[in-house]
Amino acid sequence: AYLGALHQAGLVVQEREGTSLRYRVAMDTTHDMMAALFSECCRGRVNLQFDCAPDPQNDGRPFNVLFLCVGNSARSIMAETLLRDMGGDRFRVYSAGVQPQSTLNPLALEVLRQKGHDTSALSSKHLSFFQAPEVPQMDFVFTVCDVAANEDCPAWAGQPVSGHWGLPDPVKAQGSVAERGLAFQATYGALRNRIAAFTALPLESLERAALQKAVDHIAENSKED
């Protein structure tokens, strides 16, 4: 009964040899099933699964990186801008939100401009935009708030390396404009430290497990920012 069920599911191949039936594992189908299973239950984290996930690309093209937060109006926008300017041609950088705002936070934009960043092309987007089949697969996905990290998102195509760089929401800061501006300055500084560490990694030469460990190490070392 069990072999029949496995055969019907395409996980074993049945072969007749004389009067006997022999079964062997259908490796391609089984591999695909295991990869999908661990992607769904472990979100592609290699320290929690078998080695089914491929290493991020190393074919010379830029790495695709996505930053996620709730509103995609401040933290993820800052992260997108920082990596784009600090990483240069090594990266194609994007950001999105699980509940994106219609406009970007003016204090976040002001801090970015004060630091010399061009903000003219920035916009808020829903994360579903980056899950469409025509959008390039991500190599890295970072959440910069706890809400986005806990969101029950569908598995990302290609099983990108993931990291959680959670930061307090500067939009919720109270006080005068100057006091609230300091919260955004602190967020900018914390993100800059993380991204400087990320861009210093030899991404092209590290295997997937080593990449995941390095990304997690950045998060752990940044908790005192």
Question: Predicted regions span which residues?
Answer:
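Short, hydrophobic-biased segments on the C-terminal half of alpha helices
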Residues: 3-4
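Beta-hairpin "wing" of winged helix-turn-helix
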Residues: 7-17, 24
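N-terminal helix-turn-helix DNA-binding core of bacterial DNA-binding proteins
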Residues: 21-29
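Amphipathic alpha-helical dimerization/coiled-coil segments
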Residues: 28-66
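Conserved active-site segments centered on acidic
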Residues: 52-131
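Short glycine-rich anion-binding loops that position phosphate/pyrophosphate groups of nucleotides
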Residues: 71-73, 146-149
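Alpha-helix C-terminal capping/helix-to-coil transition sites in glycosyltransferase folds
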Residues: 136-137
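Phosphate-binding/catalytic loops
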Residues: 152-225
